[in-house]
């Protein structure tokens, strides 16, 4: 600044950290979606920030630090890169210029001086690539006259710093945040200086009082005032027709005991200011190359990989709610704790599908180790796992965490007690421990997936899950067929859906006795497991969208935002067909009937031990023995009638 020369101003430099872009990304994905409405942001600076303004997402806080000046801003975020590239930036400038001019003319600035700091950011967020394109506009009028410096002096040379500093501190401590950037220093008739809000300017002009326009001035170079000073001069010129203005550039800060950095300037306009539509607005920030144009920030190289993994893994799910399924309850899915009984072909497939739906808590139960035949069919295992003979459950859990580090996954290497597999004295303690672990796991999880190799291994989990009224999804494979079904809920009462065993008139027994190799291994067409596991998880997710969860009835109509909720889905690859079947719970079912559940509730482990070691106990308890007897009588009668008819003929 030199006397006789035109006053020049230092542009603001935006300072935007990764937090801002992370908040924008979350807001865009979760709330704003396709809406392109302007968003509220704010900036803050002080006398120590050296011309930098920190941009913050959201509204300006009313209880901000008294050292800071707050600028209110608008964020326009384009939905596509084409919208950003082809935008009419001239129109954007004119619109914000109109807002600024109207605020000056209608008196808003007098009441809220920080309106002179209003700014805009035009952006495009490439959320998938973590790249953010943006252009900041700190608007001012191009038609502003040249302000010629008539006088220049240190503040301390004309104003007593002691009394003034205490008044400034008191004003900044008590004034609302929107009054802090600009205020008045008025000289009274008694030659005393007092601090007053900007709205007193009209009184000063009417009474011809001596005053200074005070601006909190954040600069990098002491020779030039900051960009907001340009707007306070324009305000005084437009609103009050002032052509000669005394400026007090306050640069010392509220903690300073002196005014050694502050400057007093007297300026005069060299011409009238003509404002005609369309307004010419300046103030676009220059990019890193020093030219007018957008900046680009790439956060993929600086963000924590765990943060990147978290946001990227849920992005596709969140995008479903933009257009396709706005009511999709992702939180209910992601917060579900899932227990997978079986870590084989079905278990691996279900786990990967749960992971893709955002489930973050998966527990495996399996008693076998990874064999050389597994990796080609079971997606969570590798050749190295076979060589080391790792337990399947623990290995699968570890592999999930390698795929997604924020996953909470554990594996339990336990055996499920099974009907038809007697427990001998030496194995009672181990089997009881496994049983207690299984019971505890079922009680602490929200959803159970039955994915074991044999029918008898599904019996005990069915009993416990029914007694605890857990959501249970059952999936089983044949050679070219598969089954996915949900078990009913006790809340369905007389309309309770059946379980896996409700169509059987015999309790499950040892299915591995007297079987050849092709009957003891899972021999199935390769695609069956992939289809079955996908549908099992989709049924689980759909159930969570119904207010009644797994107690939802079966209706031939869309029951949730994701569609129908069948009871059973059976698929056949030989003719590529699907069947949806419904069946009610069987009163004499060996797994879910009332008498079985009541007995388990009473005896717990002792019931299980007796059921396993006494072959006929379960059938007698649930009434299947009587059903079988009636069937034998009916069969005998049918044979007798058939013999009689043949005699007559």
Curated annotation (Swiss-Prot):
The active site is at 521 (glycyl thioester intermediate). GO terms for cellular component: cytoplasm; cytosol; nucleus; phagophore assembly site; phagophore assembly site membrane. GO terms for biological process: autophagosome assembly; cellular response to nitrogen starvation; macroautophagy; mitophagy; piecemeal microautophagy of the nucleus; protein modification by small protein conjugation; protein transport. Keywords: Autophagy, Cytoplasm, Membrane, Nucleus, Protein transport, Transport, Ubl conjugation pathway. A motif (GXGXXG motif) lies at residues 342-347. Disruption phenotype: Impairs atg8-processing. Sensitive to nitrogen starvation. It is a peripheral membrane protein. GO terms for molecular function: Atg12 activating enzyme activity; Atg8 activating enzyme activity; ATP hydrolysis activity. It is found in: Cytoplasm; Nucleus; Preautophagosomal structure membrane. Homodimer. NCBIfam families: E1_like_apg7. E1-like activating enzyme involved in the 2 ubiquitin-like systems required for cytoplasm to vacuole transport (Cvt) and autophagy. Activates atg12 for its conjugation with atg5 and atg8 for its conjugation with phosphatidylethanolamine. Both systems are needed for the atg8 association to Cvt vesicles and autophagosomes membranes. Autophagy is essential for maintenance of amino acid levels and protein synthesis under nitrogen starvation. The GxGxxG motif is important for the function, possibly through binding with ATP. PANTHER family: UBIQUITIN-ACTIVATING ENZYME E1, UBIQUITIN-LIKE MODIFIER-ACTIVATING ENZYME ATG7. Belongs to the ATG7 family. This is Ubiquitin-like modifier-activating enzyme atg7. It comes from Schizosaccharomyces pombe (strain 972 / ATCC 24843). The lineage of its organism: Eukaryota, Fungi, Dikarya, Ascomycota, Taphrinomycotina. The gene is atg7.
């Amino acid at each position: 600044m030199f006397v006789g020369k035109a006053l020049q101003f230092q542009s603001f430099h935006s300072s935007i950290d990764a937090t801002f872009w992370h908040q924008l990304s979350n807001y865009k994905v979760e709330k704003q979606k396709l809406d392109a409405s302007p968003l509220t942001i704010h900036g803050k600076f002080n006398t120590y920030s050296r011309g930098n303004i920190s941009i913050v997402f959201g509204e300006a806080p009313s209880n901000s630090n008294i050292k800071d000046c707050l600028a209110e801003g608008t964020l326009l975020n384009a939905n596509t890169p084409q919208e950003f590239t082809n935008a009419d930036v001239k129109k954007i400038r004119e619109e914000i210029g109109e807002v600024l001019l109207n605020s000056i003319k209608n008196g808003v600035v007098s009441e809220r001086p920080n309106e002179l700091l209003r700014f805009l950011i035009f952006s495009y967020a490439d959320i998938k690539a973590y790249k953010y394109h943006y252009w900041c506009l700190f608007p001012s009028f191009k038609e502003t006259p040249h302000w010629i410096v008539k006088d220049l002096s240190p503040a301390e040379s004309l104003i007593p710093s002691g009394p003034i500093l205490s008044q400034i501190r008191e004003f900044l401590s008590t004034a609302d945040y929107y009054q802090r950037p600009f205020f008045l220093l008025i000289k009274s008739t008694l030659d005393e200086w007092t601090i007053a809000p900007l709205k007193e300017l009209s009184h000063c002009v009417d009474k011809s009082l001596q005053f200074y326009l005070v601006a909190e001035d954040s600069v990098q170079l002491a020779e030039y005032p900051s960009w907001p000073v340009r707007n306070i001069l324009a305000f005084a010129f437009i609103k009050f027709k002032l052509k000669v203005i005394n400026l007090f550039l306050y640069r010392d800060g509220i903690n300073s005991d002196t005014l050694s950095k502050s400057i007093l300037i007297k300026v005069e306009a060299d011409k009238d200011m003509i404002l005609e539509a369309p307004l010419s607005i300046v103030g676009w920030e220059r990019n890193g190359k020093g030219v007018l144009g957008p900046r680009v920030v790439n956060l993929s190289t600086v963000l924590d990989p765990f943060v990147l993994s978290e946001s990227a893994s849920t992005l596709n799910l969140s995008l479903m709610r933009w257009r396709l399924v706005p009511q999709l309850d992702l939180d209910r899915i992601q917060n579900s704790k899932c227990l997978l009984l079986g870590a084989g072909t079905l278990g691996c497939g279900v786990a990967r599908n749960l992971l893709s739906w955002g489930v973050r808590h998966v527990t495996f139960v399996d008693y076998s180790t990874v064999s050389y035949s597994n990796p080609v069919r079971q997606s969570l295992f590798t050749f190295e796992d076979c060589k080391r003979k790792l337990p399947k459950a623990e290995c699968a859990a570890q592999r999930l965490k390698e795929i997604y580090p924020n996953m909470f996954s554990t594996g339990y290497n336990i055996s499920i007690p099974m009907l038809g597999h007697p427990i001998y004295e030496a194995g009672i303690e181990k089997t009881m421990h496994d049983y207690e672990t299984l019971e505890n796991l079922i009680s602490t999880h929200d959803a159970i997936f039955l994915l074991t190799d044999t029918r008898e291994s599904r019996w005990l989990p069915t009993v416990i899950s029914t007694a605890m009224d857990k959501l249970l999804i059952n999936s089983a494979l044949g050679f070219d067929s598969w089954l996915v079904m949900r078990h009913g809920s006790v809340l369905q009462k007389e309309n309770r859906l059946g379980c896996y065993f409700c169509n059987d008139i015999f309790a499950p027994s040892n299915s591995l006795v007297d079987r050849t190799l092709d009957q003891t291994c899972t021999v199935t067409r390769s695609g069956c497991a992939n289809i079955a596991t996908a549908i099992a998880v989709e049924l689980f997710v759909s159930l969570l969208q119904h207010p009644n969860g797994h107690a939802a009835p079966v209706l031939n109509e869309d029951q949730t935002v994701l569609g129908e909720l069948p009871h059973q889905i059976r698929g056949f690859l030989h003719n590529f067909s699907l069947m949806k079947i419904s069946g009610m719970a069987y009163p004499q079912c060996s797994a879910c009937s009332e008498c079985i559940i009541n007995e388990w509730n009473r005896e717990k482990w002792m019931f299980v031990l007796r059921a396993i070691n006494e072959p006929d106990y379960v059938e007698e308890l649930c009434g299947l023995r009587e059903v079988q007897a009636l069937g034998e009588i009916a069969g005998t009668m049918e044979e007798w009638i058939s013999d009689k008819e043949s005699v007559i003929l």
